[in-house]
A protein has these predicted regions:
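Generic domain-boundary/flexible-linker signal
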Residues: 59-61, 106, 203, 328, ...
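Small-residue-rich helix-loop
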Residues: 6, 209-364
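Active-site-adjacent loops and short helices of periplasmic peptidoglycan-processing enzymes
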Residues: 1-144, 154-190, 194-198, 210
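Generic structural signal for residues positioned in beta-strands
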Residues: 40, 49, 94-96, 124-126, ...
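A small/polar active-site loop signature that marks catalytic segments
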Residues: 121, 131-276
Length: 364
């Protein structure tokens, strides 16, 4: 689209959670909106292994096929597993966890101390991570928590489980007993973008890395996201991406790149990827992290945007529909203000930039 305003648009600044726009585009581009994540149980000898496939929204018991969070359930998986074991004449097993889909550290060294309240250890299987999001109460080992829940459900389904849950890659000769599928990626991204869930976004980045045959590490994920953006025609020169969620203060992205991704998404050449990305963003005065912004003013219901907030950074990246029906793509980053200035920065973005655009009859 036509550039109407560019003030320091090429400067690489700390994007905060607007960084999630980069990850979301890449994930939709390589995996597709309909992609689902498989959690399965396999057996070798007397050991049933729970294999994580990237679903961090699992229900502990029954899944809800009408929901995104808790779409797949470990109780359902355990009951199907118990039936398969019964068919084999097996009544007693040990249980193991295979969380080897992701490699490397589960904590990013670029994250400041105290951020444990904002992100879980990055592992490929978890019980509904949104139950803990932004609460400061993430489990220290969410994958093992999920495995123990599966083991308990297997016991409840009538299988005798011996010993504690162990950890290790499933045997190469293991055969599948049962599996459950997550909600489609488009729905999963809607949760992570609207609520700005850091854990989910880091997992999504690692899935991009796996698709690109890279290591499913922080470095592999950020490298894969940037590579896909380049493949899709975006100029990532000057970008520093230390994580996929935007939690790292060392992330540096230009507002120009963010706006270009949004403009592409809103245009005819954005395709299904772009339409899905825009649909998944929070809406002003309606939901997600914009639910309490733009209430009763221009922008209510007409702004779709990803928020970003860190101690000294605020950003907003998305679209606004003007009073005369024109859709504009924008990205604003306010960086390096003093501690305590976040509310003022957000207010300036809303009142001095976005709301005037929404109120504008400026199609000419």
């Amino acid at each position: 689209g036509e550039t109407l305003l560019d003030v320091n648009g090429g400067s690489a600044l700390t994007p905060a959670s607007s960084n999630k726009v980069l990850t979301a585009w890449a994930a939709l581009s390589v995996l597709g909106p309909d992609h689902t994540l498989t959690t399965k149980a396999v057996v070798s000898g007397g050991t049933v292994t729970l294999v994580g496939g990237g679903d961090v929204l699992l229900a502990a018991d029954a899944g809800d096929p009408s929901a995104t969070v808790g779409h797949a359930g470990l109780g359902d998986l355990a009951r199907s597993t118990a039936e398969a074991l019964k068919d084999k004449g097996v009544t007693s097993v040990s249980v193991a966890l295979d969380d080897t889909l992701f490699t490397g550290p589960s904590w990013n060294s670029s994250w400041e101390d105290g951020n444990q309240a904002w992100v879980a250890p990055i592992q490929p299987i978890m019980l509904d991570v949104t139950a803990h999001s932004h609460s400061g109460a993430y489990p220290s080992d969410p994958a093992m928590e999920a495995a123990k829940a599966f083991s308990d459900q297997l016991t409840a389904a009538g299988v005798a489980v011996t010993g504690d849950v162990t950890r290790g890659a499933a045997s190469s000769d293991a055969s599948e007993l049962a599996s459950v599928e997550s909600a489609p990626l488009a729905d999963v991204l809607s949760v992570s973008l609207k609520t700005s869930d850091n854990t989910m976004t880091e997992v999504e980045g690692r899935l991009v890395a796996i698709d690109a045959h890279r290591e499913a590490t922080f470095e592999g994920a950020t490298g894969a996201v940037l590579a896909q953006l380049g493949t899709d025609g975006f100029d990532t020169t000057g970008v520093t991406m230390l994580d996929c969620s935007g939690l790292a203060l060392g992330d540096k992205v230009s507002s120009r790149l963010l706006a270009q991704i949004i403009a592409r998404s809103a245009g005819a050449d954005g395709g299904t990827v772009g339409r899905t990305l825009l649909t998944d963003l929070p809406v002003g005065a309606l939901d997600g992290t914009l639910g309490d912004r733009f209430e009763g003013v221009g922008g209510a219901g007409t702004v779709r945007a990803k928020t970003g907030s860190l101690g000294t950074t605020a950003s907003l990246t998305g679209t606004v529909v003007t009073k005369d029906g024109r859709q504009l793509a924008f990205a604003v980053i306010v960086d390096d203000f003093e501690d305590g200035g976040l509310t003022s920065a957000r207010t300036a973005i809303d009142n001095d930039f976005v709301i005037p655009l929404a109120d504008c009859g400026c199609s000419g």
